[in-house]
Amino acid sequence: MNNNDLVAKLWKLCDNLRDGGVSYQNYVNELASLLFLKMCKETGQEADYLPEGYRWDDLKSRIGQEQLQFYRNLLVHLGADEKKLVQAVFQNVNTTITQPKQLTELVSSMDSLDWYNGDHGKSRDDFGDMYEGLLQKNANETKSGAGQYFTPRPLIKTIIHLLKPQPREVVQDPAAGTAGFLIEADRYVKSQTNDLDDLDGDAQDFQIKKAFVGLELVPGTRRLALMNCLLHDIEGNLDHGGAIRLGNTLGSDGENLPQADIVATNPPFGSAAGTNITRTFVHPTSNKQLCFMQHIIETLPPGGRAAAVVPDNVLFEGGKGTDIRRDLMDKCHLHTILRLPTGIFYAQGVKTNVLFFTKGTVANPNQDKNCTDDVWVYDLRTNMPSFGKRTPFTEQHLQPFETVYGEDPHGLSPRTEGEWSFNAEESEVADSEENKNADQHQATSRWRKFSREWIRTAKSDSLDISWLKDKDSIDADSLPEPDVLAAEAMGELVQALGELDALMRELGAGDEADAQRQLLEEAFGGVKA
């Protein structure tokens, strides 16, 4: 049975648990524990990780209340295991299963699945890929918690493919989530090194224990990330509890992260309640995304490269935001901006971009002034489909951007303006600074170049650069005063939100409605929605 079939069958088992009050998120947590036990059994690694008496067959051999009690004891025992990595995965883990028959059915069903593909058993990476599939399923279904800003896997794959991590390079994600960027970086290096077999023993050991470092604020999400890494044979530094550390990037934990040759990350959007900024940055600000940008600049060594997914406000916010962008373009070679389409994140309506940059310049990695000369911008947002379940965002949508980006990971491949995928030539040209003195044909393309001097003089160091006119845009001159529009919009939104809340509860999605209300409360500074 292939991995996709196994993921589908494992996810179908969730329906029975849902009837018993187990949420999707809790189901993934249960599967994480059980899948680890099963992985050790199927790959012959039980002796490496699990003490005798606390293995898959020990759990399977029991039924009913005895099995549930044994399972609870097993979680406690492994959470205090002498092996630090196992301890980190199982620490403070409790089962949410309360009915013995549910656990028996889950264990029995998992045991009866065909864990073979032809004549071959599942490898450790097979279990890892399967687990990633479950995480994506969870993100699709919940759209909240760990899944609300789940980075689309096609985007992660493109970013890593363009950054091209090499053996013995350290890759860091300071907002690790479920470790998607780190897993993809590991996958890329393995694809270039015959699954690490082309490397000597020291280099292989480096890849397993030192190459990948993440930091995650939420304990439950960190556990999912640790499990993801472990299933992909990424152990990380055991003194820090594995590849994914628990802590706050915007505090002392972030300062203690090692320097990294590559940073690939998607910091949390919005207020991110619970994330306190206790760290002293060069440009103090309450905007957490701007603080993450400063962390990336600080953590990169000369010549290090980065890709960061950021919301639009990072590109145009004034005051400290302007100072931070100037710092970025001074100390780093900001060579590429990818304007992402809306709807690709499960937090609907969020407008995002990817910034690609190198610390210093390739010619002089230690350069810390005037490192940015030209910034190339690819507009994958204007007049693109509304992505979602019906219109999924795929690798094919990113292929034209990958082509014009080029093979050089520092963005130094020969580049030419002009790329007209997705009917760009049919777009109208906006009346904007970007199109003054622009060739009409080039102005309809998705791929343009803007000089550092132009960004300074024409945009006052804003990086909110767009030149195509959205076909659904409205002429601003015909609109009422802004305060009137804002009041009308807020009134309509309040009414619509109330109706949607009632509808979701009628449809039996009360937990999802509560999650969305919590997001609203965070957005309004804790005021009850």
From Swiss-Prot:
Residues 424-443 are annotated as: Disordered. It holds the Pfam family HsdM_N. Keywords: Methyltransferase, Restriction system, S-adenosyl-L-methionine, Transferase. Disulfide bonds: none annotated. Gene3D superfamilies: 1.20.1260.30, Vaccinia Virus protein VP39. It catalyses: a 2'-deoxyadenosine in DNA + S-adenosyl-L-methionine = an N(6)-methyl-2'-deoxyadenosine in DNA + S-adenosyl-L-homocysteine + H(+). SUPFAM superfamilies: S-adenosyl-L-methionine-dependent methyltransferases. S-adenosyl-L-methionine binds at residues 148-153, 178-180, 216. One of its GO terms (biological process) is methylation. GO terms for molecular function: DNA binding; N-methyltransferase activity; site-specific DNA-methyltransferase (adenine-specific) activity. Its EC number is 2.1.1.72. The subtype gamma methyltransferase (M) subunit of a type I restriction enzyme. In the presence of the R subunit the complex can also act as an endonuclease, binding to the same target sequence but cutting the DNA some distance from this site. Whether the DNA is cut or modified depends on the methylation state of the target sequence. When the target site is unmodified, the DNA is cut. Belongs to the N(4)/N(6)-methyltransferase family. The type I restriction/modification system is composed of three polypeptides R, M and S; the restriction enzyme has stoichiometry R(2)M(2)S(1) while the methyltransferase is M(2)S(1). Type I restriction and modification enzymes are complex, multifunctional systems which require ATP, S-adenosyl methionine and Mg(2+) as cofactors and, in addition to their endonucleolytic and methylase activities, are potent DNA-dependent ATPases. PANTHER family: SLR6095 PROTEIN, TYPE I RESTRICTION ENZYME ECOKI METHYLASE SUBUNIT. This is Type I restriction enzyme StySPI methylase subunit.
